[in-house]
């Protein structure tokens, strides 16, 4: 391995809120966690009441100071675009009707006429 490019991998202590200390190795250094295997309900089989009320209060106090969102600007009436859409639909329908009539008139004689390459059996 090259020297000087790898991070320092040192002994680390992970401190839990319950008081448990886990010794491991990391590049981070010492750090604190809220729940570990000693106090997590899955491992202990005991139910733990989380401090959700405190979290809600912190959220409310944090966002109470922010101003309310401004009302959205009023939009112009959408009557004209609706008329344009209707006109475009009518134009497409008229074009399809014309195209359908011309295709039918071309297709009918071709179906009645025998093919030049067809061999009688």
Curated annotation (Swiss-Prot):
Gene Ontology CC: one annotated term: ribosome
Region Large ribosomal subunit protein bL31: start-end pairs: 1-97
InterPro entries found in the cross-reference section: Ribosomal_bL28/bL31-like_sf, Ribosomal_bL31, Ribosomal_bL31_A, Ribosomal_bL31_sf
Cofactor(s) listed in the protein's UniProt record: Zn(2+)
Record GO terms (molecular function): metal ion binding; rRNA binding; structural constituent of ribosome
Regions of compositional bias (Basic and acidic residues) in chain numbering: 81-93
Protein name: Large ribosomal subunit protein bL31
Organism per entry: Anaeromyxobacter dehalogenans (strain 2CP-C)
Biological classification of the source: Bacteria, Pseudomonadati, Myxococcota, Myxococcia, Myxococcales
């Amino acid at each position: 391995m090259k020297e000087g490019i790898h991070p320092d991998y040192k002994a680390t202590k992970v401190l839990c809120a319950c008081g448990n200390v886990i010794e491991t190795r990391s590049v981070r250094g010492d750090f604190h966690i809220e729940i570990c295997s000693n106090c997590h309900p899955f491992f202990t089989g005991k139910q733990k009441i989380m401090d959700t009320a405190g979290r809600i209060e912190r959220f409310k106090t944090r966002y109470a100071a922010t101003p309310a969102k401004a009302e959205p600007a009023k939009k112009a009436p959408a009557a004209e675009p609706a008329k344009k859409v209707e006109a475009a639909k009518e134009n497409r329908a008229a074009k399809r009707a014309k195209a359908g009539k011309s295709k039918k008139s071309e297709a009918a004689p071709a179906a009645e006429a025998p093919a030049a390459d067809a061999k009688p059996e």
